[in-house]
Structure formats: structure tokens, C-alpha cells
Amino acid sequence: MPPKEDPEITALKKELNDLVTKIKDEQKKAADCTLQEKCSDMGDVPKVRISTKKFLKGHINKVNSVHFAGDSRHCVTGSLDGKLIIWDTWTGNKVQVIPLRSAWVMSVAYADSGNFVACGGMDNMCTVYDLNNRDAQGNAKIVRELMGYEGFLSSCRFLDDTHIITGSGDLKICVWDLQAGKKTSEFDAHAGDVVSISMSADKNTYVTGSVDRTCKLWDVRESTPKQTFFGHEADVNSVCYHPSGFGFATGSEDKTARLFDFRSDQQIGHYEPPNKSSGFTSCALSLSGRYILCGSDDNNIHIWDTMKGQHNGALSGHENRITSICMAPNGMALASCSWDQNVRVWV
């Protein structure tokens, strides 16, 4: 028999649900029209015509994560073959191959400066490498191994060359000072695994997505969220800050992508593929914010017009589920990686 729930917890859960319902009712009152209605007189966007420009072959196991450097040319990928590969996406060449101590990598991050990369996963730590210095074996030198997590490392992003922010399966967010090798802050962020982090362009704020189905907006200096967003009916697998700085996009296990707005404090866009069969693992936005792109379990990258909500087609080519996509900072290319062991650069 399952254990009986404490009556106090039951009462608190009911109170919480009532408050959430009340918030949603207030939001509905404030929403005088939908984004689609407001944009109905806008012209349709042209169909996205991009194809695989570079096919990056080098990993020999599932590739779990990809992230661009600030130069929009180099990207890093992490795979279950126990390697990080730094790619030149313009030529398709490998720049560096970094062997990892643990093959169970789930997230990678490239510093905007191009000097450092970080990774982490089932080893419950975040490892930072200096790409400009080599160890005795000739591999990129380990700068820091950031330990102390009680769950897997699911997401990491550089604030600058000396600070990194991480999200993990122990529900926490940590900010680290890389020079000191110490946490500058650590706090419980969600009621479930913190799965995804996306930074604003100025690095002052960030958005998180979680298994608890919520997304939160944070100030890097504070340990309490500025705003919490509800709406998804399953894990939020990916969040992506809107280029305008006024909102963010999400991709979820509930087979939908959504657009949230900070100013109206609620969801303003809802996007579904033509055949709603697979969840979304990752999302990205075009530089203008007009297109939202989502990598899916159905091996495709789906595209929508964010304003009018129309499905704009899909990028196909991968032969297994897409695990991660990343838009180049200049908006000129999209990188994607998959369980098919390959990385593609779309232009």
C-alpha cells in the first residue's frame, strides 16, 4: 500500500493549485487578444530554405550536446564516445579533440571568448578546459573540476571567462568563480531536475527550464526567481532566450513549443507539428526572433513562424533523435547533433 500523505501536505498542495489557478485567471483577464490575432494582417514569412552545409563526422557514439563560440565559427560537441570535439564549422575540420575522464557527457558550453569549453553529465561534476594551453599529453588543459553536485549535471553556460553557471539533477543552480574554484552562489531552483539554461545577451539574466514543467527568469545576482511561467504539461527540455530580451521560447516533452513574454507575464505562443507524435528535445530562435526551431524525437528540426503560429516546414537529414540544436550568435548558421553520431551545420 502506498504511504498515506500527510494532511498538511495535501492542504498545502491544494492551496498552491488554487493560487496557480487564480494567477492563470488574472493572466487571462489581462490578455485582451492573442499574438496570432494581433499579427493577422502581417504577411506570411517565406519558407525557410536552408540545407546541410557541413556534415561533421568524427564521433563514434551518440552526440548529446552542441554549442557555438562567440565567433559564430567554432562549435563544441560532446558525445558518449568520451570525447569533446572543437569544430571549425566553415571548413568542417576538427580543431581539437579532447578526451574526457567520463564518457557520460550531457551538456557542453563554449565561452564567448573562445578560450574555454566546459562539459558535464552523469559524472556529477562540471569540467572546464583551457583551449589555449595543453597538458603533458598534448590535450586541452583542465582548468577546474567543479564538484559537489548530488545529481547529474544537465546544463552549463559561461557568464564570462571566469564565471560559469550550472543546472543539475539535484534541483540546484550554482554559480562558480573559476579562478577561485569556489561556488559564489548555490540554491534550490526548481521542484524537479534543472534541465536547461539560456543566458540573455548581456549575461545579466537567464531563464531555466525543468522537469517540474515550469520555467523561471533569474537575475544572476539573486537566488530567488523574478518570474515563474506555467503552461507545459510535461518536462521542459529546452529554453532559449528571445533576441529582443523580452521573452523566451521552450521545447517540451509534451510535444509542443511555446513562446513566453516577460512583460505580460504569460505564454503568448503555442506551436505544434503537423503530426503530434514526438516530444521536443531542444529549441532555438532566429536572430530576428521570427522563426522558432525545435529538434525532435522524430529526427527532424521543426520550424514555425512565431508571430502567426504557422508551421514552416522541417529540416530532415538526421537518422535518429536530435538531442541538441544551437543557433550561431550571428544568426547565420544552425548546428544540430543527434543519436545518429553526426553533427550537421545548416545554412
Regions found by a protein language model. Give the residues of each.
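Intrinsically disordered, low-complexity acidic/Ser/Thr/Pro-rich linker and tail segments
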Residues: 1-61
